[in-house]
Amino acid sequence: MGDPDLNPAEYDFIAARGRVEAKKKSAGEKLTSLEDAVARVKDGDHVSAGGCLFSRTPMALVREVLRHRRRALTLSRNLTCTEGELLMAAGAVTRVVTAWMSIGLPWGVSKILRHYVESGAVGLEEWSHLALGLRFRAGAMGVPFLPALTMLGSDLVGVGGMKTVQDPYTGETLAAVPALFPDVALLHVHRADRFGNCQIDGYPHMDADIARAATTVLVTAEEIVSEEETRRYPDRTVIPGFVVDALVLAPFGSFPHECYGLYEADYEHFAEYTAAIDARGPAAVGEYLERYVYGPPAWNDYLDLFGGERLALQAKRARELTR
């Protein structure tokens, strides 16, 4: 359950609007390196990750945050997956704001989350999936809250300081779902031009709202295309360049998670990872961090650990599923 007095600045819509309005809306180039992009993440920041569960997770950015040894972060994501487990096990995250945390139904609720929450090392603030989406939407709109029926009648009423309001038209009680204004957004997209105009294939999840609600927006892209390409299909540009602060080219930037149409999630890798946790508990995540995060110095070195054949197999699976 959430602490109603926890980080009230997250709900300060006037200050948050001021921060977003103060951002430079120039058409300058946003391309940079992973190291330079993640240097913008500070200890104590509230970091929101795009995608959903193991879909379009910004793994290259998460890995770089871990390599920067950031501390006392809050992580918010609609459905949290292995990226959350790695951040907790590394001591980077001390608070998680989510609707669910797992790799998927076959593996059940995260045992790593349970360990760190029950030990008191990590605070958990649980919202419904809809409520968390509304929080990002309210943040993107620059309003203090959005009314809804979600969570009413459940034990989640009051989580994170959520209050109820009376509908002025009918007198009915509504949930006043508070806006969420992250310090940093971590996002992964299919393609972007050098000015940060980002396109996403398939379901966009909550990324567009997160990008507009956050003070600082860091994006990795599978491909950098010309601005003529983004102008040719403007309807596909779900994140405008003026909200993006840093853009990094990162092929397979979600791996071992999926990126719709380009590569599938590596379920065999997930099975190996969870089997290790079943056998050795949180220590297995520490071993994983040493091998996949702290060991390989660059993103391409990380991908080399999986091998070209394994990456090609997941790309083939994605093509077969989206024919």
What are these regions (language model features)?
Residues 1-323:
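Conserved alpha/beta enzyme-core scaffold
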